[in-house]
């Protein structure tokens, strides 16, 4: 949510910054709503002042024993008018808030302008894709040959975009998440959390999934309940960030560095026909999520740090990747600045996103009403989040980049302790 004060005082500046995202701010609606709000505010305050004056006159008349019947009639009529004005103001304020919630975050000045992923800027590359002396297979073919990935059974159980993993492939998937958790807790200073896998609508509003992106979620409505509505989490960013919702934090407690390993659930409503093969785009997938809560002046440095923490996973796994600075048109709704990490997938002969690390500024903090206490006042925190990493896509990268000519998969050295020293995945465990 944008700063309402800046939106009112500098609407043209806000419009120019949003235009860099190819978002058109409806200035006429903004001005109309603001003018109407001011008028109703003045009207309501005048009616309240008159009511207070009449109440004082009634009290004074009672003391003097005067006939105050006419004053009672007037104050009752005034109450009806005031109630109507207050209701009208409340309805308008709801519309104003809905309008404000529909606005994306303002991009940082360092973010390049562009319409889509073709305009993103490559910052650096690490590692070189291997040169194979044999035709490299994709992860689907590898997984099926090793009988470790079963998409047919998953389709019978739940439909498309699900998978059943078994044997050493399932163990490799688990080893990846354990390795990531250990790295981020032991070396990078994150506190691990276990969080709910479904959340209420207030939480989704706080991090920006609602009201705009409701169709991307799997919603849960308990039978016989009209008010208890939930959704499965699309990312652990939602429960982790909302742990500080409606709180005033001590400045000395910042930064907060939180982490969770959870399944993530996404409807992929806008992805029909895209990545229908394999593990790249699933309705359910595991992810290790990193979240930081910082002071405003520290958030850009924290973004570099958080992104480096995600990069460490790829480096230790010796997976080639590149770091991309997203352009204004490709950033997420609530992001101020975003880096994507794209890992090389030998089966697709291309780089694919495996982590997205974003500085949200105070966008989420305003929605959640999360502040920290300074010596002079309470200020909104800045929030950051990033994947450290998406476990399924990391599994894909390991399978495709560590495949051997005989169809086996070499287990990366850093993962072998998590797999009882196993060096190669050759066939399914009995």
From Swiss-Prot:
One of its GO terms (cellular component) is cytoplasm. NCBIfam families: serS (TIGR00414). It is found in: Cytoplasm. Consists of two distinct domains, a catalytic core and a N-terminal extension that is involved in tRNA binding. This is Serine--tRNA ligase. The keyword ATP-binding applies. HAMAP family: Ser_tRNA_synth_type1 (MF_00176). Pfam families: Seryl_tRNA_N (PF02403), tRNA-synt_2b (PF00587). It comes from Hamiltonella defensa subsp. Acyrthosiphon pisum (strain 5AT). L-serine binds at residues 235-237, 289, 387.
């Amino acid at each position: 949510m944008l700063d309402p004060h800046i939106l009112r005082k500098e609407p043209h500046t806000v419009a120019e910054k949003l235009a860099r995202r190819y978002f058109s701010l409806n200035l006429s609606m903004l001005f109309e709503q603001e003018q109407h709000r001011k008028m109703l505010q003045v009207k309501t305050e005048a009616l309240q002042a008159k009511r207070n004056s009449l109440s004082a006159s009634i009290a004074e008349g009672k003391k003097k024993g005067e006939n105050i019947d006419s004053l009672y009639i007037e104050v009752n009529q005034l109450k009806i008018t005031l109630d109507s004005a207050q209701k009208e103001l409340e309805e308008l304020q709801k519309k104003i808030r809905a309008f404000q919630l529909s606005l994306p975050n303002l991009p940082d000045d360092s973010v390049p302008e562009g319409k889509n992923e073709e305009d993103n800027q490559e910052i650096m590359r690490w590692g070189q894709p291997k040169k194979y002396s044999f035709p490299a297979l994709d992860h689907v073919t590898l997984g099926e040959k090793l009988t470790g990935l079963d998409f047919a059974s998953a389709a019978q159980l739940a439909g498309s975009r699900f998978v059943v993993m078994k044997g050493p492939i399932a163990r490799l998937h688990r080893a990846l998440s354990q390795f990531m958790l250990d790295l981020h807790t032991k070396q990078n200073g994150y506190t691990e959390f276990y969080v709910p896998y479904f959340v209420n609508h207030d939480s989704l509003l706080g991090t920006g999934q609602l009201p705009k992106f409701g169709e991307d979620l799997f919603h849960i409505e308990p039978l016989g309940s009209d008010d208890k509505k939930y959704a499965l989490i699309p990312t652990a960013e939602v429960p982790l960030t909302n742990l500080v919702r409606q709180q005033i934090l001590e400045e000395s407690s910042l930064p907060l560095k939180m982490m969770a390993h959870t399944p993530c659930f996404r409807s992929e409503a806008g992805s029909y026909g895209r990545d229908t093969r394999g593990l790249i785009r699933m309705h359910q997938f595991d992810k290790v999520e990193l979240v930081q809560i910082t002071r405003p002046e520290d958030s850009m440095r924290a973004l570099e740090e958080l992104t480096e923490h995600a990069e460490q996973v790829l480096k230790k796994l010796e997976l080639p990747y590149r770091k991309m600075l997203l352009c204004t048109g490709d950033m997420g709704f609530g992001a101020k600045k975003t880096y994507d990490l794209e890992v090389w997938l030998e089966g697709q002969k291309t780089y694919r996103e495996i982590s997205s690390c974003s500085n949200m500024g105070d966008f989420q903090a305003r929605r959640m009403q999360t502040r920290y206490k300074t010596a002079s006042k309470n200020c909104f925190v800045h929030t950051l989040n990033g994947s450290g990493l998406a476990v399924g896509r990391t599994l894909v990268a390991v399978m495709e980049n560590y495949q051997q000519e005989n169809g086996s998969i070499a287990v990366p050295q850093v993962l072998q302790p998590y797999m009882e020293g196993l060096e190669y995945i050759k066939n399914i465990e009995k």
